[in-house]
């Protein structure tokens, strides 16, 4: 099993090592939580949940992680370019997180839209992270 914090740390390390994504984000655009004055574009981590769909109880071996992409000036094209870069880096990736085993990422959902209330383009990427323990 992989703790949600360990998983997020591994995801962010993998994304931060991607030079093309860093260029799209202007360097410091990967944020755990965005401050009100955060520069655009940026990516934040949204809800993370660990759940066993068969038994209905919490289970760190099967987690959902949501990443949010935020863009203002360059809009939808920028949002989609950042989303594509993240998908290329994470979809079907296998992460080794500590001694517990391998965590495989599968893209479950992606959406880009304009948020009229916030006046920003907003992209959502939801990944399922499935950990298989080493024996």
For each of these PLM feature ranges, what is it?
Residues 17, 88-135:
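Acidic-leaning, charged glycine-interspersed low-complexity segments
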Residues 70-92:
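Mid-chain, well-packed structural core segment of small domains
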Residues 28, 43, 65, 105, ...:
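A broad, low-specificity signal marking well-ordered, structured residues that form hydrophobic/aromatic
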Residues 50-53, 72, 112-114:
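Short beta-turn/strand-loop junction motif enriched in small, turn-promoting residues
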């Amino acid at each position: 099993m992989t703790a949600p914090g360990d998983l997020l740390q591994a995801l962010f390390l993998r994304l931060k090592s991607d030079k093309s994504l860093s260029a799209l984000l202007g360097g410091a655009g990967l944020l755990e939580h965005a401050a009100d004055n955060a520069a655009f574009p940026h990516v934040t981590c949204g809800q993370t949940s660990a759940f066993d769909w068969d038994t209905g109880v919490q289970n760190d071996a099967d987690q959902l992680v949501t990443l949010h992409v935020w863009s203002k000036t360059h809009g939808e094209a920028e949002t989609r370019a950042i989303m594509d870069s993240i998908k290329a880096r994470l979809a079907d990736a296998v992460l080794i997180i500590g001694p517990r085993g391998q965590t495989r990422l599968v893209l479950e959902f992606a959406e880009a839209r304009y948020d009229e209330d916030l006046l920003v383009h907003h992209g959502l990427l939801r990944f399922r992270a499935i950990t298989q323990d080493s024996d």
